[in-house]
């Protein structure tokens, strides 16, 4: 459980990095900016790796789609060139804030 706290903090750190990477840009800019894409995909993969390490007990306590979060890591690492960047953008804009909120609530 002690490590779970660290994993959750690291996930929050990665979310913060992604938010800084995409601050002030829209989807069209993201889809045409390979440097930002690479940085974001790396952080999403890291979030997925950390999600795999969180204990089942903690996963039960935090109601987020852990399996899907971990699954993105597998796609990012094994099928990097098959990643749908539109879906990645949707993940950034729709899913990261609720994930951050859930983790922050758990850590309090």
Spans of model-derived segments:
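Solvent-exposed interaction patches of small proteins and small membrane subunits
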Residues: 1-108
């Amino acid at each position: 459980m002690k490590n779970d706290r660290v994993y959750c903090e690291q996930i929050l750190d990665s979310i913060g990095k992604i938010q800084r990477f995409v601050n002030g840009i829209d989807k069209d800019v993201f889809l045409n900016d390979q440097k930002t894409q690479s940085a974001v995909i790396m952080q999403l993969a890291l979030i997925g790796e950390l999600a795999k390490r969180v204990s089942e007990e903690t996963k039960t306590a935090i109601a987020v789609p852990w399996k899907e979060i971990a699954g993105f890591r597998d796609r990012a690492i094994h099928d990097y060139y098959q990643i749908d960047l539109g879906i990645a953008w949707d993940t950034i804009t729709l899913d990261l804030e609720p994930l951050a909120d859930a983790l922050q609530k758990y850590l309090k």
